[in-house]
């Protein structure tokens, strides 16, 4: 039974209301510093911890709760007579409910003007110590680190005579240990990122010790293949616009491959400005098989589907605008695993109501960029900054005698944006705001060029006057010859080959325009 509670919080969301309800249930309130003042100013009877222990706060508040009368009351096992006898001998009442959240260390070090002394002063000592004590003794003590749990605890107390069940206490305790682990991890990340002069400005993006925090969203029936087990975890620092922020409106549970492909589709489609045009991306095995722009979602989908209607079967489709009824009716004619959009109209949802296996994911558009990209290798982890660079037309360098026309420049920019999301080696033919042929994942660039050309022919699409993007430089002129023979009149590529002069000369020989980006988009 909860008779006495200690409340000491940095995040004061809902704390007054929670304390008022505790008081109404007859719970004695202990508190510290600003929390105690807030409760007292709100008319609640509260005892300062310094008065409770008979020992004043000291060292500028560094020592407040580090006292046997606090930790003894938290850690004592109520089922052990010797523990309870020790409390009685030293006149220590039990503390049955602990509500603590910690100094805002992560918010502090995120500030550009943060200094090492600022960071050090925001390392909480007393808070984690109390939290760990209470979580260790969760059989007898209820511990809250998240204001979202206030209502649950109050509900159980009201229903059970001020008692909280073991299952709830256990869940809250595991939440505490996860929270303190993340807190210590953030401190380690920060301290091991500092340069020799320990200045915030000299911080390395890659700390000596890297701690990451993820919460499990779901376990899956299997992984990439049926013999593999799998689960999906959400980054606790997921940025705006990230796939992990999805809300599933309908459909079966997402599989491992669904999520991997959905991420590829969403990252590609949100790279297009929704204010400029509707975009549709169709993904198969993490590669775009059709990408297009249109005046609306339906037009964008129709054009994207035409690129490769065979590969689109059972694919993942993403839009950067609301999916309306017209587009929904067109998509519903095909077999699709997952549909993603910033929103779905009521009429569009009604179209798919009869297709409950289709997964509808709603994700708000956002411009957040992940801090890191990861790739697991045997015994280690490769960490890099995301490939977030979008080349602007003003950055392009025309290296041929012929310059691209305005239409060709638009097609080149579109092709380059798509190529970034195609597995290397990538060759992408585009024209009129749509992909015409995609060659992906080949060991030689010339083979990717041939495949892209063949895909366009199979789809009945002409490549005459098309634009081509290559995610990396042409090592020889052979790849360029293939795309020109297929009908391309302009090419965009990074440049940087020792044979750039030979490739540029070949472009001039063919009379096409070529621009260099100076940026490569390898994708493995």
From Swiss-Prot:
It catalyses: (6R)-10-formyltetrahydrofolate + 5-amino-1-(5-phospho-beta-D-ribosyl)imidazole-4-carboxamide = 5-formamido-1-(5-phospho-D-ribosyl)imidazole-4-carboxamide + (6S)-5,6,7,8-tetrahydrofolate; IMP + H2O = 5-formamido-1-(5-phospho-D-ribosyl)imidazole-4-carboxamide. One of its GO terms (molecular function) is phosphoribosylaminoimidazolecarboxamide formyltransferase activity. Coiled coil: none annotated. Pathway: Purine metabolism; IMP biosynthesis via de novo pathway; 5-formamido-1-(5-phospho-D-ribosyl)imidazole-4-carboxamide from 5-amino-1-(5-phospho-D-ribosyl)imidazole-4-carboxamide (10-formyl THF route): step 1/1; Purine metabolism; IMP biosynthesis via de novo pathway; IMP from 5-formamido-1-(5-phospho-D-ribosyl)imidazole-4-carboxamide: step 1/1. InterPro entries: AICAR_Tfase_dup_dom_sf, Cytidine_deaminase-like, MGS-like_dom, MGS-like_dom_sf, PurH-like. GO terms for biological process: 'de novo' IMP biosynthetic process. Disulfide bonds: none annotated. Residues 1-145 form the MGS-like domain. One of its GO terms (cellular component) is cytosol. The keyword Electron transport does not apply. Keywords: Hydrolase, Multifunctional enzyme, Purine biosynthesis, Transferase. Its EC number is 2.1.2.3, 3.5.4.10. Pfam families: AICARFT_IMPCHas, MGS. The IMP cyclohydrolase activity resides in the N-terminal region. Belongs to the PurH family. This is Bifunctional purine biosynthesis protein PurH. The lineage of its organism: Bacteria, Pseudomonadati, Pseudomonadota, Betaproteobacteria, Burkholderiales.
